[in-house]
Amino acid sequence: MILSFHPLFSADRNIICAGREPGPSDLSAILEARAVILPQGCPQGLYFMARDNCPNIFPNYDVRFRYPGKIGQTRLFRENSIPHPPTKIFKNIESYRRCYQGTHAPSLPLVVKFDWGGEGDTVFLVKSYRELETCLEHAAKCENSGQRGFLIQDYIPSGNRSLRVVVIGDCFKSYWRSCADQNAFHASLSKGAAVDWSSDPGLKEMGETIVAELCHKSGINLAGMDVIFPESGSPEKPLMLEINYFFGRIGLGGSKEYYRILRKAIKRWIGSLV
């Protein structure tokens, strides 16, 4: 029996768990299932109920929950030898102050990334120490509300664009997100970037290769990953920026096309089960 908790994928049995905690009836259904299909926004409780009680689940969100946030992703990249911009992790402001005491300070320009948030909303290009202090003041305020942790990352000029590689089961789809404004920093569609499906196919293939390597090592099979290519030095060597488990669908052709790809990928995954 194939069990689906995904509202847009029909299986032998279908259950909606949105807006509630999973309970005994959900566990009973999972125990009877040969495979479980989970929603993209699957909460941790439902995920591990399925993970611990069924041998086959889609998607594989092990690293999403075991390596949470941008700090967790950096640890994941390090542990799996995935190339990424040089990064320092700070669990709070105090750890930053201990690292940079007195007149010692990080080199500029740099990128500050708070541990939470998406679509570039908590990522800042810092060109001056006044801007850096503003980011640190904001981090201190966030700590007071319970949100803590940030990264300081080398700024890698990448031609005002990034490559989004979306993995959906065994399918990889990639496209550039490019900014016409040479002064722009965020290469995200929500910040005004444009989709480019055709430029530099060789680089796109390299980007897909590094994503495929991470997927092979980690088990990720549903995510949008951001990759950049340095303008100087070794432009042919892609660097992983981050993993997005919730991602936009414009670059995939819209929601209808995304769900078409997803349903086909899930069916192939089910067909591959022994």
Predicted regions and their residues:
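Active-site nucleotide/adenylate-binding loops and adjacent lid/helix of ATP-dependent enzymes
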Residues: 64-150, 205, 274
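Short glycine-enriched loops at secondary-structure junctions
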Residues: 41-44, 63-64, 172, 178-180, ...
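Conserved N-proximal alpha/beta basic substrate-recognition cap immediately N-terminal to
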Residues: 2-91, 98
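Phosphate-binding site of ATP-dependent enzymes
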Residues: 121, 127-217
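Protein kinase-like catalytic core scaffold
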Residues: 110, 151, 173, 223, ...
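C-terminal active-site "lid" helix and adjoining low-complexity regulatory extension at the edge
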Residues: 219-220, 229-274
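Short, charged, surface-exposed secondary-structure boundary motifs
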Residues: 66-72, 185, 252-255
